[in-house]
Swiss-Prot record:
It comes from Helicobacter pylori (strain ATCC 700392 / 26695). Substrate binds at Y6, K26, Q27, L28, T29, A56, S178, N228, Q313, V314, H315, Y316. Changing K183R: Strongly impaired catalytic activity. Belongs to the DegT/DnrJ/EryC1 family. This is UDP-4-amino-4,6-dideoxy-N-acetyl-beta-L-altrosamine transaminase. Keywords: Aminotransferase, Pyridoxal phosphate, Transferase.
């Protein structure tokens, strides 16, 4: 039986050639390709500065540690509970307290729920572009300006996504992207921070590499605390090659999503999120929201899909439900996040899927739901 992952890398001969060139060059790290990758990201996203990292998690930590001077009197940061846990974990690692906001039915933070969470301790808002759909940028920008907050974006899902015909990446003070193997473009593991703030860029650049400023070939100076979060040349070469194909890879995902939309239209079991999009999305995920009557048998539905070779996933368990967060904060459940978690399933959507496979998956999904016969 053929299996279909919810996402997987799309690699070709050019990608392999780019990697082999680095291996043959013997310059495996701290070479020109990481710089070229950063330059290409700036051009692709329309931003001034980009820094590539060995993961989006280390990119988040670097941003959180450097966007502003830390103050114990202003240590709360509002974010979404529907994200991969790194979004909040790195806030904890940086000394901040995450405050979780409600979400909308598209998986993004509810901008109308933010203001009531703001107080004298609030430092910033960290949004997440769920599944590749941009948050309502203007609303968040206005709120941050009104209350003198920093606007940071975890755009790990959203490379190539747009808001009002402009690419995500330049709206917040800084934005983080992920190049993990299941993202629209990949470096196996990897990430980036982009910003138009030159001072912040320099701080993060030092933090990424031991806080060290090289004066010349044999001598340097340590200016601040730092880590080794660099992306090596092998990964940078792969990223550079993948980025050239980003529009094509996005188009393939869009074609798959549109095929799902057509087959799923007006079905009685679930609502796909893709038809609700107003702006271009990376389509990192293809989420569906099951109708409430299916909530109690979600695990059985997922098991049935997997038996059919459809390796669906769930994105995400609310972060505050994890044991660590319950022990630290004992956060009360947020109904919007709870409902989303109970309803959401991510179906296979990636550039390796041909349309015949997408059609077969879609019809198998409908048959799976039909087999449960819940009134």
């Amino acid at each position: 039986m053929k299996e279909f992952a919810y996402s997987e890398p799309c690699l070709d001969k050019e990608d392999k050639k780019a990697v082999l060139e680095v291996l043959n060059s013997k310059q495996l790290t701290q070479g020109k390709r990481s710089l070229l990758f950063e330059e290409a990201l700036c051009e692709f996203l329309g931003v001034k500065h980009a820094l590539v990292f060995n993961s989006a998690t280390s990119a988040l930590l670097t941003l959180y540690r450097n966007f502003s001077e830390f103050s114990a009197d202003r240590n709360e940061i509002i974010t979404t509970p529907i994200s991969f846990v790194a979004t909040a974990n790195m806030l904890l690692e940086s000394g901040y307290t995450p405050v979780f906001a409600g979400i909308k039915n598209d998986g993004n933070i509810d901008e109308l729920a933010l203001e009531k969470l703001i107080n004298e301790r609030t430092k910033a808002i960290v949004s997440v572009d769920y599944a590749g759909k941009s948050v309502e940028v203007e609303s968040v920008q206005k709120l941050c300006k009104k209350h003198s907050l920093s606007f940071l974006s975890d755009s790990s899902h959203a490379l190539g996504s747009e808001y009002q015909n402009k690419k995500v990446g330049g709206f917040a003070l800084a934005s983080v992207f992920s190049f993990h193997a299941i993202k629209p473009i990949t470096t196996a593991e990897g990430g980036a921070v982009v910003t138009n703030d030159s001072e912040l860029h320099e701080k993060m650049k030092l933090f990424r590499s031991h806080g060290m400023l090289k004066k010349d070939f044999f001598e340097g100076e340590v200016k601040s605390i730092g880590h080794n979060f660099r992306l090596n040349e092998i990964q940078s070469a792969l990223g550079l090659s993948q980025l050239k194909k980003a529009p094509f890879l996005m188009q393939k995902r869009e074609e798959a999503a549109l095929t799902y939309d057509r087959i799923f239209k007006d079905n009685p079991y679930f609502t796909p999120l893709h038809p609700l999009l107003k702006d271009k999305s990376s389509n990192h995920l293809y989420p569906i929201l099951m109708h409430q009557k299916f909530f109690t048998c979600k695990k059985l539905i997922l098991e049935s899909l997997h038996k059919r070779g459809i390796l669906a996933q769930v994105h995400y368990k609310p972060i505050y439900q994890y044991q660590l967060y319950q022990q630290l904060f004992n956060t009360a459940p947020l109904k919007s996040a709870e409902d989303f978690y109970h309803a959401e399933i991510s179906l296979p959507c990636h550039a390796n899927l041909n349309l015949e496979s997408v059609q077969n998956i879609a019809h198998s999904v409908l048959k799976t739901f039909e087999s449960f016969k819940i009134e």
